[in-house]
């Protein structure tokens, strides 16, 4: 069975990162804070998918990523392959362009992130490292 390739990005600004709250009605990972992103379409490369998802979900322009992936998760049971990058290289005013997917978005400090219900609790280590860099 082929894994569904999923890409996501952690948008950063000084001392804060952007997270999206997945709507409670979502089938996968409802009612948790997660990174903006989505599925790579057939024939699409991961970076183009990442740029498309940022534009669709947040109305911002992703100009690049800060090096290699900061997180990689493969879940054979759900046939998912998730790759996450971080980026300070984006522009535009971020807003929630798809409220049916995310019922809220927000900028958070490391202390605030520690109090959130994340899609995966192990994300906290990565997020703290990014904000301390």
Residue spans of the language-model regions?
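Short secondary-structure boundary/capping segments
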Residues: 1, 9-10, 24-25, 32, ...
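Conserved N-terminal beta-strand and adjoining loop/helix that marks the start
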Residues: 1-18, 39, 70
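Nudix hydrolase/Nudix homology domain
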Residues: 26, 89, 99-133
């Amino acid at each position: 069975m082929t894994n569904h390739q999923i890409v996501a990005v952690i948008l950063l600004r000084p001392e804060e990162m952007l997270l999206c709250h997945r709507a409670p009605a979502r089938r996968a990972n409802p009612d948790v804070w997660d990174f903006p992103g989505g599925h790579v379409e057939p024939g699409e490369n991961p970076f183009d998918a990442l740029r498309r998802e940022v534009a669709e979900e947040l109305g911002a322009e992703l100009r690049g990523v800060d090096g290699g992936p900061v997180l990689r998760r493969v879940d054979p049971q759900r046939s998912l392959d998730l790759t996450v990058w971080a980026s300070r290289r984006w522009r535009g005013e971020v807003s929630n362009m798809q409220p049916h997917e995310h019922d809220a978005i927000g900028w958070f400090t490391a202390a605030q992130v520690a109090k959130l219900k994340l899609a995966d609790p192990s994300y906290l280590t990565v997020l703290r490292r990014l904000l301390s860099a």
